Amino acid sequence: MKTVFFDIDTQIDFVYPAGALYVPGAERILPVIAELNRRAPLVISTMDAHSEDDPEFQLYPHHCVVGTTGQHKPACTLTDASRTGESRQIILEKQQLDCFSSPRLTPLLSELNADRYVVYGVVTEICVNYAAFGLLKTDKVVEIVTDVVKALDEKKAHEMFSRFIEAGGRLTTSATVLASL
């Protein structure tokens, strides 16, 4: 089964307490994200890439502005191309909450022709939600790794998990995913 991992928005502004839009506890999932990304056959890492005057800043504080430290991914979430000579990580920048707003994503998914998508990152009820439900539209197996996501609103996250299961998605754990590799 061809599997592609989706590392959603694990950027400095979200995952560290000093970040502009810190998700509480996100730094604690970084070691597992690092392990998943390291062992993934292929990982697509989405990244917010906002301009200084991005309309999203009417809803959320300034974060992940292009060229700032906060927009970068923590080094531990990047795969090491030097080991194999080729990268197994595709960075997909986006200016909106939904990664499917990137014109690169749909053609990329068609090209990759995966059977299974494994999703993790931040924020569970926002960008992870958009990615997971968008991937369900591909009629492939889509799994959210529940111990490797973090929410701003736990109630909304649990509601999202329920809707995701009802829509045909699966919930899994990092131990199960890692054991399957």
List where the protein language model places each region:
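Active-site acidic carboxylates
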Residues: 1-93, 141, 152-153, 157-181
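Cofactor-binding loop segments of dinucleotide-utilizing enzymes, especially the Rossmann-like FAD-
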Residues: 8, 48, 122-124, 147
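Histidine-anchored nucleotide/phosphate-binding helix
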Residues: 32-36, 126-137
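Short, catalytically relevant binding-site loops at active-site mouths
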Residues: 50-52, 97-99, 125, 150-151
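Short, well-ordered secondary-structure micro-motifs
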Residues: 56-57, 102-104, 130-131, 155-156
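Internal catalytic-core helix/loop-beta-alpha segment
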Residues: 72-125
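A short glycine-rich beta-strand->turn/loop micro-motif centered on a GG-aromatic cluster
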Residues: 118-121, 141-154
